[in-house]
């Protein structure tokens, strides 16, 4: 089983619309580990680890997000996996 790590930066109307909570729920459904947090500049940052197909599914979902979100851009970067996470959670 191949484990990858993706770093995602989501911009648009993504704070105050349950984007973090929805991302956490979606990532857990996909069996991913990592975290999601709001950034001071209004973006949402995500670090997720898991199988490539599940990471791709999360990346695709991030372009839509929850119902009230308006996503302008999702920047993705693949990084070496560290497998340091045991679950997926919202951080501050």
UniProtKB/Swiss-Prot annotation:
Its domain of life reads: Bacteria
A GO molecular function assigned to this protein is: acylphosphatase activity
* E.C. designation(s): 3.6.1.7
Q: Which residues form the Acylphosphatase-like domain?
A: 5-92
In this protein, the active site sits at 20, 38
InterPro entries (alphabetical): Acylphosphatase (IPR020456), Acylphosphatase-like_dom (IPR001792), Acylphosphatase-like_dom_sf (IPR036046), Acylphosphatase_CS (IPR017968)
Keyword annotations for this protein, in alphabetical order, are: Hydrolase
- Reactions the enzyme catalyzes: an acyl phosphate + H2O = a carboxylate + phosphate + H(+)
Instruction: Name the protein family.
Output: Belongs to the acylphosphatase family.
> What is the recorded name of this protein?
Acylphosphatase
- Source organism of the structure: Marinobacter nauticus (strain ATCC 700491 / DSM 11845 / VT8) (Marinobacter aquaeolei)
């Amino acid at each position: 089983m191949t484990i990858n790590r993706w770093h995602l930066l989501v911009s648009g109307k993504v704070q105050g619309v349950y984007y973090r909570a929805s991302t956490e729920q979606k990532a857990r459904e996909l069996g991913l580990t990592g975290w999601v947090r709001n950034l001071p500049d209004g973006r949402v940052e995500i670090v997720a680890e898991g199988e490539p197909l599940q990471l791709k599914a999360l990346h695709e979902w991030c372009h839509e997000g929850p119902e009230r979100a308006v996503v302008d851009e999702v920047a993705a970067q693949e990084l070496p996996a560290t497998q340091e996470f045991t679950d997926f959670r919202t951080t501050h």
